[in-house]
Structure formats: C-alpha cells, structure tokens
Amino acid sequence: MAVPKSRPSTLALAFWGAHIVAVVGAIWIGWSWAALWWLAGSYAVRMFAITAGYHRYFAHRTFKTSRVFQFILALLAMSSVQQGVLWWAAHHRDHHRNSDQPDDVHSPVQRGFWWAHVAWIFAAREKGTDFDRIRDFAKYPELRWLDRNDRLIAVAWGVVLLAIGGATALVWGHFVSIVVAWHVTFCINSLAHVLGSRRYATSDDSRNNPALALLAFGEGWHNNHHHYQRSARQGFYWWEIDITYYVLKLLEAVRIVRDVEGVPRHVRDRVTAPNRSRVRAVATAAVVVPPS
C-alpha cells in the first residue's frame, strides 16, 4: 500500500529552491580550496551511500550487513535528499519490473528526457512509498521512521554541516553537493537508457556509459547492471571503473559488509547482439523481489 508523502507543488518548491540557494550561495561565498574540499568530500560520501545503499543494497540486496550499518547507509543516503530510503528502493524495483515499458516510472524511451530526468518525481501518483514492494526492509521500524522523516534528515544534515564548517560547509558541502548529486543520479535514468553502448541483449534500452560510470561511482555501466541485477559489481571487467564496488570490497575485508555478490564468468561473457523483444519474458522473470 502506497502512503502519500507530499504534494507535488511542495516538492517542486523545495527542489527549485535548493537550486537557487546553491547558485546564489556559491556566488556569495565564492570559490576556495575549503569550498572545493567540502564539495568533493560530501559528494563522495553521498554518491557512495546512494549507489551502495539505496541502489545495490536496499533495491537489489547484492550484499549483506548488520542492522546498525544498514541504518547508517540509509541515513547517509538520505543526506542526498532523494526522498526516503524505502520510497527510493520500492520505486527502483518497479523500474526493473517494467524497464522501458509503459509502466516504467522513469523511462526516457516512453516519456522523453525531461520526464525521466526529474519530472516523474513530481507526479502525484509517484509520491507514496509502496511498502508491499519493499516488505523485506519495511519491517524495520527505524527505516520506516527515516522514510517518513526525509525532510527532517535533510535539515539536520544542513545544521550539522553549518555547525562544523560554517557557511562554506552549508553552501558547498550541502546545497551545491546535493544539486550535483541529484543531476548525476538523474542522468542514470535519463541518459543511461539513451547514450552509450550495449553489450548485452537486455529487454530495455540500457546502455554502458563510461563518463556516467566515473561520475556515478560505477552506475554508468547500466547495460551490465540490467543484464545481471544480482551483482554488487557493475563494472564487469577490470577496465570498467566501479568505485562503489571497490569500497564495498574494502568494507568486506574489514567485515563491515559480507557476501558481496560478484558476476559469474558465464554471465559476464554471455555477450549477445541487442534484441529487446526476444528477452522480455526472461528479464521480467529475473527481477527478484525478496520475500518478506
């Protein structure tokens, strides 16, 4: 059952307001090495939390971890202000069930660039969290609390950064970092199904895009990902840079996470010419929603 979160007009006001604050604030504060460090550091933390947390853990369960680190991942990911952890993962599971089909929540093939990039988020019917889709994580009360308090988390992050680093940290480490992380994440939806190469015959138009892979810590190897969603590794070959996977392996080495899923050789090497219709039924059946 989907629980409404906010009116689209309220969300749009906050979204565009953040852009205005980021631009005006950056001009007002100005550039400095401190500003650059705040931007780079906060972006790196956010992007790892989005890609490892929201995507590879909560949406796809490609590795395991403790309940404590699960909460930390969710909290860090929610600093990106991309709505609640359960909302994000539930919608992403829907995307994989219907990728580039009429029911896909953010397909550029079906609705165009602008819809896939950001407009879908403002649609009233997409405002709720479908807890039935994410029952495996919705059973944790602390994650439900985070999910319904996404605005509080966003404000709290801003207050903490302001207290630590002043106006420079607030503007560059919070607002500018958030806006940049937004659009890099959104480009996976809007561009990684349009621009790039196709190694595998997935049932959608997913592409491998090296530039997006660098910016999004490995998420740009999107055709790889749609070919085999169970893997925590999206850069299937050594030359396909996947920063999030490298960090996950380090965390596995120190036992913070475990059972980080790789790519079976026979899956990786099964290169075929693109043919969407031929594999639609197979891909639909392959989307795994873990039992509650």
Which residue ranges define each predicted feature?
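Non-catalytic, topology-defining segments of multipass membrane proteins
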Residues: 1-187, 191, 231-292
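Glycine-centered flexibility motif
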Residues: 25, 112, 196, 218-220
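Active-site-proximal inter-transmembrane loops
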Residues: 134-142, 198-221, 225-228
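Transmembrane-cytosolic junction motif
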Residues: 190, 194-199
